[in-house]
């Protein structure tokens, strides 16, 4: 490709004007950052990013993460000008564009492919959903970890299949967020030299210049994280940008941060370098003045001059196509020389699991003393991961407690000298862990992350994003209730279950015994487009005798009749529970049965799976004509009224817990068979009284 600075500048200004016009027409959005970063993104894409626009899901492509998601028009403009093809639901390229000019004209409109912040799956070329600042940085660390795992697992001396890089574009807001510290620290420790962050230091936020609230020496901070740092004083300096990108790619022992100083809203004479350029349209007059400053026709909107598409095709497109074709030839040869590895990789790409992946999941014998569900979860996890090589994960420094350490032969630890390890050590960085797990899932691995349920609050943003993106992240949350005991209310989750259940598209499973744990893991692995939380206990739970009670396979339907009235009688009362409280309901059921009272126990490990069942099944489990109902759960009451009705009883937590042995806490808060029995009897009497008055 011939050197042509004038044509390069034309491309840069096209990005700027498309961004201004789109925000102005939508009457909402963020024009300033795309205007500032257009030269940075252009030179990265045109000269360095390895990406074939005709095959946008090519496995060895470089990943570009727009962590500064409010600058979405920057990405949409690039995708349009680079003529990136859209892919169909099966991931195959189509003849249509990922982003058309019409899509840009409908920026931020209902049903468009150009939403206000980039959304994974909605727009081809968007590698991850961003918007909440800092999340893209955490995702990029997970993506870089995945790249290293692919290299370690699949590369052969005669066939180095994988060597892609991950670039993330971030801003002052990203750097202020705590997750950037966690993610950068982890990446530096792991020496992820395939990771390059480009930090737009424009020193302007919504409230004004950053000196109001931010005075960090970012480069010193990152050197302390074991990062290589580079500095570009002017975002419009093409030679300095080129030198920085070349040097960053040459670093082999640590990640790189490139600090770029830009002027937000560059070219807008009255609004550049002010907060007015950040999160609102510039205004018709200011847009015209900015276009005049660029030498642009002031009366043309959504204008792409001749030669711009061709310039992208000659650089970005031609480079990417050549790299992808070279890789495809290597892969074809690899397929012949290493067919088993090639088949494994094909399964990963197809979002499949190996045949027999669940064949070693144990069945647990009845045991009144039982086992903590965190322990049974650890056994099931190891049985699955030993058969699914791309199932990797770890904990926020809690693997010995959450029982998520993979112990099978060859599992190993993922470290800078062993990127093929399956055990990820996230350190005490829950927020970064959640975001990195998303990055791993976006790379088609089947990852998990674990901590105590109480600390799920530290990672709520990435959990929410995993549901928005429909990626199969698995979160293992242990120490799930006041069962934590003496650690007291700071460590006893109360409202966390309700919060997680409130996330659309997130499967929350709280199994009641070891065999339900096994089924919970089956459910979590079954859907490659749904994240899951497996919530388990610290304390032992009795393993129910499945010869007397229903099979745990009912877990797959979210809720099921565990024990029922004899002879098909209509139950006088329904006892429903999750987790550690299930065995309490079984004890009460047996007492009622001994008194000749027809009762039913419903295990409800997953409300959202149950809600996806047909109405006939739901009514068969919870008959509408049975009003006497008792719900038992060591958590907040929110949501249970849906199942017990307005007059049903709830044995739940209405306050925070306390520091004491579990046996005392059960008595204090009413989670004993005696208390639940009384609640059941009161419900039966309430219904009798109501009927006598009818």
Regions found by a protein language model. Give the residues of each.
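A short glycine/serine-rich beta->alpha loop
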Residues: 5, 22-31, 59-68, 122-134, ...
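Thiamine diphosphate
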Residues: 100, 106-129, 145, 149-163, ...
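Short internal beta-strands
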Residues: 65-67, 194-201, 476-477
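Non-catalytic terminal/interface segments that mediate subunit docking, oligomerization
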Residues: 325, 329-472, 550-564, 568-579, ...
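Acidic-glycine-rich active-site phosphate/pyrophosphate-binding loop
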Residues: 3-17, 49-51, 98-122, 400-415, ...
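Glycine/charged-rich beta-loop-alpha catalytic/anionic-binding loops adjacent to active sites
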Residues: 18-23, 53-61, 115-129, 161-167, ...
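Cofactor-binding active-site loop characterized by glycine-rich and histidine/acidic residues
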Residues: 37-189, 405, 440
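N-terminal capping segment at the start of a domain
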Residues: 14-28, 200-202
């Amino acid at each position: 490709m011939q050197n042509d600075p004038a044509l390069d500048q034309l491309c840069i200004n096209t990005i700027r004007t498309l961004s201004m016009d789109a925000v102005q027409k939508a009457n909402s959005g963020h024009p300033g950052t795309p205007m500032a970063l257009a030269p940075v993104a252009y030179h990265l894409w045109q000269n360095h990013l390895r990406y074939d626009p005709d095959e946008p899901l090519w496995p060895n492509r470089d990943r570009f993460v727009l962590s500064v998601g409010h600058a979405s028009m920057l990405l949409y403009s690039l995708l349009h000008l680079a003529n990136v093809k859209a892919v169909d639901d099966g991931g195959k390229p189509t003849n249509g564009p990922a982003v058309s000019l019409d899509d840009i004209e409908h920026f931020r409109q209902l049903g468009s492919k150009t939403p206000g912040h980039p959304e994974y799956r909605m727009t081809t070329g968007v590698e991850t959903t961003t918007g909440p600042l800092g999340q893209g940085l955490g995702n990029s660390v997970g993506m870089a970890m995945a790249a290293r795992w692919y290299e370690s697992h699949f590369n052969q001396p005669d066939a180095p299949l994988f060597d892609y890089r991950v670039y993330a574009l971030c801003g002052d807001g990203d750097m202020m967020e705590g997750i950037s510290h966690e993610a950068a620290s982890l990446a530096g420790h792991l020496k992820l030299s395939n990771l390059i962050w480009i930090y737009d230091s424009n020193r302007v936020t919504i409230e004004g210049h950053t000196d109001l609230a931010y005075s960090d020496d970012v480069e010193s901070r990152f050197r302390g994280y074991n990062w290589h740092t580079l500095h570009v004083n002017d975002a419009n300096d093409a030679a300095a940008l080129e030198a920085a990108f070349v040097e960053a790619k040459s670093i082999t022992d640590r990640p790189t941060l490139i600090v770029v100083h830009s002027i937000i809203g560059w070219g807008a004479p009255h609004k550049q370098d002010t907060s007015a350029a950040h999160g609102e349209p510039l205004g018709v007059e200011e847009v015209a003045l900015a276009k005049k400053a660029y030498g642009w026709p002031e009366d043309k909107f959504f204008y792409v001059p001749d030669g711009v598409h061709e310039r992208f095709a000659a650089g970005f497109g031609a480079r990417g196509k050549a790299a992808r074709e070279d890789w495809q030839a290597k892969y074809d040869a690899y397929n012949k020389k290493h067919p088993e590895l090639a088949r494994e990789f094909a399964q990963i790409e197809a979002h499949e699991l190996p045949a027999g992946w669940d064949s070693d999941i144990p069945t647990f014998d009845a045991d009144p003393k039982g086992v903590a569900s965190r322990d049974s979860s650890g056994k099931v996890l190891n049985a699955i991961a030993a058969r699914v090589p791309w199932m990797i994960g770890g904990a926020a420094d809690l693997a010995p407690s959450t029982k998520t350490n993979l112990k099978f032969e060859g599992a190993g630890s993922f470290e800078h000298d062993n990127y093929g390890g399956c055990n990820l050590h996230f350190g005490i960085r829950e927020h970064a862990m959640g975001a990195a797990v998303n990055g791993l899932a976006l790379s088609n691995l089947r990852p998990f992350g674990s901590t105590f349920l109480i600390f799920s609050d530290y990672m709520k943003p990435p959990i929410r994003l995993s549901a928005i993106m429909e990626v199969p992240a698995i979160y293992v949350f242990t120490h799930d209730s006041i069962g934590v005991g003496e650690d007291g209310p700071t460590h006893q989750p109360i409202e966390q279950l309700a919060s997680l259940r409130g996330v659309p598209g997130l499967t929350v499973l709280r199994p009641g015994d070891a065999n339900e744990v096994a089924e919970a893991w089956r459910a979590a692995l079954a859907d490659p487009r749904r994240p899951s939380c497996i919530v388990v206990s610290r304390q032992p739970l009795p393993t129910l005798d499945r010869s007397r009670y229903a099979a745990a396979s009912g877990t797959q339907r979210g809720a099921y009749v565990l024990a029922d009235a004899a002879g098909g009688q209509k139950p006088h009362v329904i006892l429903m529970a999750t987790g550690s409280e299930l065995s309490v309901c079984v004890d009460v059921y047996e007492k009622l049965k001994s008194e000749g009272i027809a009762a039913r126990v419903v295990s409800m490990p997953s409300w959202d799976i149950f809600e996806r069942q047909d109405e006939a099944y739901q009514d068969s489990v919870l008959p509408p004509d049975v009003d006497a109902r008792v719900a038992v759960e060591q958590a907040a009451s929110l949501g249970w009224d849906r199942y017990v009705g307005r007059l049903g009883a709830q044995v739940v937590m209405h306050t925070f817990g306390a520091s004491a042995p579990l046996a005392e806490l059960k008595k204090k808060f009413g989670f004993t068979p005696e208390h639940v029995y009384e609640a059941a009897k009161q419900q039966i009497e309430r219904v009798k009284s109501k009927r006598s008055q009818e």
